[in-house]
Regions:
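Bacterial Sec-dependent N-terminal signal peptides
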Residues: 1-22
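Basic side chains
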Residues: 2-3, 150, 166, 219, ...
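Enrichment for repetitive, rod-forming helical segments
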Residues: 9-10, 157, 310
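Internal mixed beta-strand/loop scaffold within catalytic domains of large alpha/beta enzymes
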Residues: 118-216, 232, 347, 359, ...
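Short, basic/low-complexity N-terminal boundary segments at the transition from targeting/disordered tails
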Residues: 5, 159, 163-165, 169-171, ...
Length: 381
């Protein structure tokens, strides 16, 4: 019965995709070299026009959402936010990179920094709305391919600004693919050694105004080529925001729920080794006082169920099954795949192949509106 239900779900997803595909353009790709300030300066100069537009749209959106002048909100936010020390301690090159983006684009430093504090600003707002990412992890078991994948859902005003940064290899870092929009150092990504990271906001978990922000954690993960070093980092660094990290390291996948006071691994113990996550904690109990555990009908729970039923009991989960999960709209009010309306949407959908020859498949926008584009690392060409 479960297999019949799954086949029906897959068929429905395929039909929905074929009917709603709008032929979106493939994601824009940009190659950057160097590191630190130099890297940021390239980013800022190359995308100066787009960064100016994003800054203006951020301010317009913030004013509409909060009902007050965005510059005043920014001032109040940075009175709360004290992330500089953690960034300079754990990822000093990335602090310089943000400075370079600001200089290259001609924007104020705080206007660029707040774009890179996406989750931290959401925490400051303390609202659950519009934080709807859905993620999947598949280990390489029984000769199968390892994947991590995600629909990255953020505000609708970012539509049309999807970019893939290709960071060239240096003596200190592997080549990297980074999904983001202009002005931001990372939303998610992977490196050429088969390590990658996908994230889900966990607004319910306790946060810290002095921890290391999510974007900087992501880039540090992608800089790593050592499994033990990477796992040690994610479990010991002080976290600024409640966040779930699906981390792939070649043949293996891990899931960690991070809060201000603890990091807890989530493992559903599935026979096929799969993991999945949306936007509510499943293992970490370091929650804010307002959070209630009995919200089983929430948007996040509905999406988790949709993803889980597609991958949990399948012996071999391939990229086709993952695509069907990420395109799913079982509940029209709580879809995994979100159209650009009502404040938020699926900004990018990404599938990272970790084992064998690592590569990335990505759509610019909701995956039911375009086909995935496969992108390979330089050493695989």
């Amino acid at each position: 019965m479960k297999r019949v239900l799954l086949l029906l779900l897959l068929l429905y997803s395929s039909v929905t995709y074929s009917q709603s595909s709008t032929g979106r353009k493939a994601i824009r790709e940009i190659t950057l070299t160097g590191s630190g300030y130099e890297l940021g300066l390239q980013h800022g100069k190359l995308l100066k026009k787009e960064i100016a537009e994003i800054v203006a749209k951020w301010k317009e959106n913030t004013k509409a959402q909060l009902g007050k002048d965005a510059d005043l909100v920014l001032k109040e936010f940075f009175q709360y936010a004290h992330f500089d020390d953690a960034i300079k301690k754990w990822t000093p090159d990335l602090y310089e990179e943000v400075k370079g983006i600001a200089a290259g684009s001609g924007q104020a430093f705080n206007d660029i920094m707040v774009l890179n504090l996406l989750d931290e600003f959401w925490v400051y707002e303390n609202k659950l709305a519009n934080h709807h990412c859905s993620g999947i992890g598949v280990p390489a078991m029984n000769g199968n391919t390892a994947y991590i994948a995600q629909n990255m859902d953020i505000e609708s005003y970012t539509d049309g600004y999807q970019i893939l940064l290709r960071l060239s290899k240096t003596d200190k870092r592997p080549e990297q693919f980074i999904l983001t929009h202009p002005g931001v150092i990372a939303l998610n990504g992977m490196n050429e050694t088969g390590s990658g990271a996908c994230m889900n906001t966990l607004m319910q978990l306790k946060a810290s105004s002095t921890g290391l922000p999510v974007a900087f954690i992501v880039r540090q993960i992608l800089n790593s080529t050592d499994k033990e070093e990477l796992l040690q980092f994610i479990q010991t660094v002080p976290h600024a925001s409640g966040q779930n990290y699906i981390i792939g390291i070649r043949n293996e996948v891990y899931d960690f729920e991070a809060s201000a006071n603890k990091v807890v691994r989530f493992d559903p113990k599935n026979t096929n080794g799969t993991i999945y996550h949306t936007n509510h904690p499943l293992a970490n109990d370091d929650v804010k006082e307002w959070f209630a555990f009995n919200t089983t009908s929430s948007n996040s729970h509905v999406r988790l169920s949709a993803v889980q039923q597609r991958v949990k009991d399948i012996p071999t989960v391939d990229d086709g099954i993952i695509k069907d999960a990420l395109r799913s709209k079982d509940d029209k009010d709580n879809p995994v795949c979100r159209a650009p309306k009502n404040g938020g949407f699926t900004f990018v959908s990404v599938i990272m192949t970790l084992s064998g020859t690592p590569n990335l498949q990505v759509t610019a926008g909701p995956p039911d509106e375009s086909e995935y584009k496969k992108i390979e690392f330089t050493n695989a060409r």
